[in-house]
Swiss-Prot record:
It is found in: Cytoplasm. PROSITE patterns: ACETATE_KINASE_1, ACETATE_KINASE_2. This is Acetate kinase 2. The keyword Ion transport does not apply. It comes from Lactococcus lactis subsp. lactis (strain IL1403). It catalyses: acetate + ATP = acetyl phosphate + ADP. Keywords: ATP-binding, Cytoplasm, Kinase, Magnesium, Metal-binding, Nucleotide-binding, Transferase. The record marks 178, 239 as: Transition state stabilizer. GO terms for molecular function: acetate kinase activity; ATP binding; magnesium ion binding. Pfam families: Acetate_kinase. The active site is at 146 (proton donor/acceptor).
């Protein structure tokens, strides 16, 4: 039986799902966390069982070796060659990659070159690709790009209002991210709403530690909040999101500990957002606990977070000239009842009314009242399934 592995490699993590294809049956899934850090742990789930293993994991290559060892140990596979395809999530494809692509040496080199567009992500994606290539050299490897879904953006949306030469000579433009997730939840919403995707105007809110909002018309991305890199857009767990670019040179001039622009970018990427304002955590669960205890910095961080989500969602009502539905997905979007309530109530003048009993349950489907002019949905994302499907399509 042929099996396909969907892989999402982060800077210190490796998330995976093993599928039986083309049936799309999930055999097992898991994650390696804190790779290269203290307290490394792996989680493997199958047959309603959950297995944990704590041990030092120094790099992605070791994580891949441990993963294959666990698949054999738990008899999820009997030999490596049962895995005939591996799909890798790659965040930035630039203008070069507009569809999922079989990984060749040339493709891998270009993914490395595009790391400037996703400095937190593409290097980690490359580590995952190279680690699996060493262990499973005969498996078909496919790169699935976060930016591909946004290749339909009109020029008025993806161009920045800067001199044209910077676009033509240096490809400086909006690329977006989380495209695989936005595409998947839009397709799932079509089933719930009972209308063809071609007839729908949707606003999708992928809200996790990283977050982005996308305007979708007739199944195509027409605008999105992330930009040249995933730093742009709404306030995120550790990323600042949208802000005045003049802050960068001012921070350099003001803080003698900062050596160059990259130091500032690192702060905006890794030490800002919810973490930077709350000075507590990048995790919304931690923030919610602190808000409940009256922590003023946590309260401010939460208010800023919700406010920026509302601003981008409101913008996209204008871009689409109205919308049929607002869709929440990803870690915060799927699980944080308060964020959904405060965002929707803050946009009630668009005709959205949340049903609190449905919102508290947070189950897949509509969580707005029947009379709500704009439907509000919770749709769990499944980027791994999209990745597995794209591998199958490439065979």
């Amino acid at each position: 039986m042929e099996k396909t592995l969907a892989v999402n490699a982060g800077s210190s993590s490796l998330k995976w799902q093993l599928y039986e294809m083309p049936e799309e049956t999930v055999i097992a899934k898991g994650i390696f966390e804190r790779i290269g850090l203290s307290g490394s742990i792996s989680t493997t789930k199958f047959n309603n069982e959950e297995h944990f293993r704590k041990q030092e994991i120094v790099d992605h290559r070791q994580a891949v070796l441990l993963l294959m060892d666990e698949l054999i140990h738990f008899k999820l596979i009997h030999e490596f060659r049962e895995i005939t395809g591996i799909g890798h999530r790659v965040v930035a494809g630039g203008e070069f990659f507009k569809t999922s692509t079989v990984i060749s040496p040339e493709v891998l080199a270009e993914i490395k070159n595009l790391s400037t567009l996703a400095p937190l992500h593409n290097p980690a994606n490359v580590l995952g690709i190279e680690a699996f290539q060493r262990l499973l050299p005969d498996a078909l490897a496919v790169a699935v790009f976060d930016t591909a879904f946004h290749s339909t953006l009109p020029e008025k949306a993806y161009r920045y209002p800067i001199p044209t030469k910077y676009y033509e000579d240096y490809s400086i433009r909006k690329y977006g991210a989380h495209g695989t997730s936005h595409m998947y939840v839009a397709q799932e919403a079509e089933k719930v709403l009972g209308k063809p995707l071609e007839d729908l105007k949707l606003i999708t809110a992928h809200i996790g530690n990283g977050a982005s909002i996308t305007a979708i018309e007739a199944g195509k991305s027409v605008d999105t909040s992330m930009g040249f890199t995933p730093l742009a857009g709404v306030m995120m767990g550790t990323r600042a999101g949208e802000m005045d670019a003049s802050v960068i040179p001012y921070m350099l001039e003001s803080d003698p500990s900062l050596r160059n622009a990259q130091d500032v970018i690192d702060i905006l990427n890794k030490d800002s957002g919810v973490l930077g304002v709350s000075e507590l955590s990048s995790d919304m669960r931690d923030l919610s606990e602190a808000v409940a205890k009256g922590n003023p910095k946590a309260i401010l961080a939460y208010e800023m977070y919700v406010d920026r989500l509302k601003k981008f969602i409101a913008q996209y009502f204008g871009v689409l000239n109205g919308a049929d539905a607002l869709i929440f997905t990803a870690g915060v979007g799927e699980n944080d009842t308060a964020v959904r309530t405060d965002v929707v109530n803050g946009l009630s003048w668009f005709g959205m009314e949340i049903d609190e009993s449905k919102n508290v349950r947070g189950a897949f489907g509509i969580i707005s009242k029947p009379e709500s002019k704009v439907k509000v949905l919770v749709v769990p994302t499944n980027e791994e399934l999209v990745i597995a499907r794209d591998v199958e399509a490439a065979k």
